Amino acid sequence: KLDMQLRKVTIETPLNLILDKERFNVRQLREYQNMVYLLDANGIFVFDNLGNYKRKLPVTGVNYINFQDNELYFVQDGSLHFVNLYTSERRSIKLPKPYATGLVSDTRLYLFLPKQLDFYAWQ
């Protein structure tokens, strides 16, 4: 944790105690609803806003995560997966192409290939 007034780190969490240091490959770090989500080759690690480890979502092959309302979402193995942040309930939508990642809004779904963007109406 960083104290902005003192401009100094007040709490540190050593990740090598949690992550497999042989496969340590952080791809993304996001804060959402007072939690910190670290996307790594080993999965999605969830920490509270003080850096305390909470849980791990065992997903691999994911390059990007994002959030919509109370769900975390990501593209994996040809599907768009949603995980409820509070109940851990999962749902998936099969995608028509092998998209790399996607963005979800209230009314649109944006899906990305290496050289193409497709978007769909979304409800």
Give the role of each language-model region.
Residues K1-K21, D40-V59, G78-K97, L117-Q123:
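Surface-exposed loop/turn elements that mediate protein-protein interactions on large endomembrane-trafficking
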Residues D20-Y32, V59-N70, P96-R108:
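Repeated scaffold domains used in trafficking and secretory/extracellular systems
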Residues F67-N70, V75-D77, S88, L103-S105, ...:
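Short C-terminal domain-edge/linker segments immediately following a structured domain
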Residues Q33, A41-N42, D69, D77-G78, ...:
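Residue-level signal for tight coil/turn positions that link beta-strands
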